[in-house]
Amino acid sequence: MAEFEIPDFYVPFPLECNPHLEEASRAMWEWIDANGLAPTERARDRMRRTGADLSGAYVWPRADLDTLTIGLKWIALTFRIDDQIDEDDTAERLPARMTAIDELRGTLHGLPVSGRSPTARALGALWQETALGRPATWCDAFIGHFEAFLQTYTTEAGLNAHGAGLRLDDYLDRRMYSVGMPWLWDLDELRLPIFLPGSVRTCGPMNKLRRAGALHIALVNDVFSVERETLVGYQHNAVTIIREAQGCSLQEAVDQVAVLVEAQLHTVLQARQELLEELDRQALPSRAREAAVDYAANVAANLSGQLVWHSSVERYAVDDLQSAADPRATPTTSSLGI
């Protein structure tokens, strides 16, 4: 694959990292081991190289230890799901993928889990722990965003199975959810003094902020991950879509994605200002307003944090792919045993 230069992404927001990272990381690994989520050395090494704990410390920099620990469990679990589907399921058997995703979705609604699925069992138990005592409106918002995240795996497999060409606009609509940020930011509400009022959680400026922030992080991810994803045959990447649609060089496609990243940054700035105006219009009690402003500031800080995370970890390095292709290598556990 041709070499390319990663753009110098500019993000004006302060970098925040959770001071409880070390202690929460230990708890995360204990939970991974207890639930059998890294059953082989290869799977364990992949989790180490991912730095799920560091990513979570940047997602929830203001959370207390207990909230951060819950968050790290979620982020580790979903990185494991992502690896099992995007890299281990090379055959992309659509019916099997649909069955696996349906089982994961069912756990969020209390449906029984098959005995052979450690990931689904862990998801069901983690959701029960997370949802306990939470408002129904928050639970509904989280489930909606998490199901949208899971659905992207089935949608992508369906597009591949039918040989459908990938359009950038359609991809971006999906990418907002496949990157996972909307439900990750739902979890950020757990550390606020009060949950966001429904009128704030679903208002236009908040939706605009959430989408632009998610796409900023997603498009940065596409640049950092394009080499690895190309090598494993994964085509759902903005760089790849632009390159194939325009017949341009890899560097030209990367530079075009950088322009899209900058546009999302401007939208984040605009949406934060519009949110302040919307909060004035709603005339909320001071605690609700403060919670909304705090939540929005955390979304902005995530742009800086996730950029640093991408630059710091080996999740998107490619040196492990050659050893994984060796027939003597230890397999990861499933091709959709999830």
Swiss-Prot record:
Site annotation Important for the cation stabilization at C-11: residues: 149
Superkingdom, taxonomy of origin: Bacteria
Catalyzed reactions per annotation: (2E,6E)-farnesyl diphosphate + H2O = (2Z,6E)-hedycaryol + diphosphate
Cofactor, how bound (note): Binds 3 Mg(2+) ions per subunit.
This protein's pathway: Secondary metabolite biosynthesis; terpenoid biosynthesis
Top EC class for this record: lyase
EC code(s) of this entry: 4.2.3.187
Residues that bind Mg(2+) 3: 221, 225, 229
InterPro entries per the UniProt record, alphabetical: Isoprenoid_synthase_dom_sf (IPR008949), Terpene_cyclase-like_2 (IPR034686)
Residues reported to bind Mg(2+) 1: 82, 87
Miscellaneous section: The 1,11-cyclization requires isomerization of (2E,6E)-farnesyl diphosphate (FPP) to nerolidyl diphosphate (NPP), the abstraction of the pyrophosphate from intermediate NPP leading to a (Z,E)-hedycaryl cation and finally an nucleophilic attack of a water molecule.
Free-text note on domains in this protein's UniProt record: The Asp-Asp-Xaa-Xaa-Xaa-Glu (DDXXXE) and Asn-Xaa-Xaa-Xaa-Ser-Xaa-Xaa-Xaa-Glu (NSE) motifs are important for the catalytic activity, presumably through binding to Mg(2+).
Protein name stated in the entry: (2Z,6E)-hedycaryol synthase
